[in-house]
Amino acid sequence: MYKLLKKSGKARRGEFTTPHGVIQTPVFMNVGTLAAIKGAVSSMDLKEIGCQVELSNTYHLHLRPGDEVVKKMGGLHKFMNWDRPILTDSGGFQVFSLSKIRKIQEEGVYFNSHIDGRKIFMGPEESMRIQSNLASTIAMAFDECVENPAPREYVEKSVERTTRWLHRCKDEMNRLNSLPDTINNKQMLFGINQGGTYEDIRIEHAKTIAKMDLDGYAIGGLAVGESHEDMYRIIDAVVPHLPEDKPIYLMGVGIPSNILEAVDRGVDFFDCVLPARNGRHAHVFTKEGKINLLNAKFELDDKPIDEGCQCPACKHYTRSYIRHLFKAKEMLAMRLCVLHNLYFYNNLMEEIRDAIDGDYFKEYKERKLKEWGGRA
């Protein structure tokens, strides 16, 4: 259940109550594709840096170790030792982005595994069954994510199919939640708005799925080739047509400036691999924007990554030392930078929540964008 606590302009401060705890929103979900954050970051680390929600990937966990294995181990929460909310995506995005060979039909999608090439089928019911086996807190509906730009006629047909798939997802989720051997029989379902960059298709689809009384709603199919201006235009068009008493999730968007702009437009949930991926390559976020620790100017820099930051890396190590670790190819380098970036993101969301609570979000947003100077 979502409770709207405060608004500052269109920015929303809320609480989302789930079977695994209350999520304070706006929130950034830390992406652990295979039930782990890449960069040697543990579930204990995630708690220390303030992570509220972990996101795992249905497609990848279905292939490795297999959702049946996870179910036999008691579900994702027990498997990875995490007692806070977990969101699993439906696998749809990976099916359409990773599979070179795929065939879309009404019942679902036939595709080849990116690991061993074997033929796999996934449709709405299969996605729900896999996510039920994983026993995540929130399951995402199975949808088709089209590339931007895509021909209007194709997008229209795709959205109609995605809507039919959503009805099938909801029916299957209700069935699974009623079974005696289901680990999490209170699993929640979010629907996904699609429609490419066509505002009218997006709006009509938002109106359609809003009637389905789902636990939350996502805006999908963005950050896949369109400009930031197009992204903001679509968010502006869609948000007013989604229920105000449900959380809104902007999928896969994680550039800090994009997060601020989306919060300003009423978005509550975010996820992205960006902080961990950047951290593994020595790109770290600071109050002044993103920096690359491999640059020669940091060789003798005795400052922490970001002065004033309370993350484990900044409290104990210098830029010079971490740069040395990267040059020496020590795994600790990646771990420290991933920890820092995840802390930066979770701390950013805490500051955003405080700014909405204090009704100064507009001023906060403008100040942060000015400080970052286009570098974050």
UniProtKB/Swiss-Prot annotation:
Entry-linked Pfam families: TGT
Gene Ontology terms, MF aspect: metal ion binding; tRNA-guanosine(34) queuine transglycosylase activity
Cofactor(s) it depends on: Zn(2+)
HAMAP family in the cross-refs: Q_tRNA_Tgt (MF_00168)
Entry EC no(s): 2.4.2.29
Protein name (database record): Queuine tRNA-ribosyltransferase
Reactions catalysed according to its record: 7-aminomethyl-7-carbaguanine + guanosine(34) in tRNA = 7-aminomethyl-7-carbaguanosine(34) in tRNA + guanine
Note accompanying the cofactor annotation: Binds 1 zinc ion per subunit.
Catalytic site: 89, 271
Source species: Clostridium botulinum (strain Langeland / NCTC 10281 / Type F)
Residues binding substrate: 89-93, 143, 194, 221
One GO CC term on file: cytosol
The encoding gene: tgt
Lineage top rank: taxon: Bacteria
Region RNA binding, annotated ranges: 252-258, 276-280
Functional description taken from the UniProt entry: Catalyzes the base-exchange of a guanine (G) residue with the queuine precursor 7-aminomethyl-7-deazaguanine (PreQ1) at position 34 (anticodon wobble position) in tRNAs with GU(N) anticodons (tRNA-Asp, -Asn, -His and -Tyr). Catalysis occurs through a double-displacement mechanism. The nucleophile active site attacks the C1' of nucleotide 34 to detach the guanine base from the RNA, forming a covalent enzyme-RNA intermediate. The proton acceptor active site deprotonates the incoming PreQ1, allowing a nucleophilic attack on the C1' of the ribose to form the product.
InterPro entries, per the entry: ArchSynthase1/Queuine_TRR, TGT, TGT-like_sf, tRNA_ribo_trans-like
Keywords of the record: Glycosyltransferase, Metal-binding, Queuosine biosynthesis, Transferase, tRNA processing, Zinc
Pathway note: tRNA modification; tRNA-queuosine biosynthesis
Subunit structure: Homodimer. Within each dimer, one monomer is responsible for RNA recognition and catalysis, while the other monomer binds to the replacement base PreQ1.
Residues annotated as binding Zn(2+): 309, 311, 314, 340
GO annotation terms (biological process): queuosine biosynthetic process; tRNA wobble guanine modification; tRNA-guanine transglycosylation
Stored Gene3D superfamilies: Queuine tRNA-ribosyltransferase-like
Family statement: Belongs to the queuine tRNA-ribosyltransferase family.
Annotated disulfide bonds: none
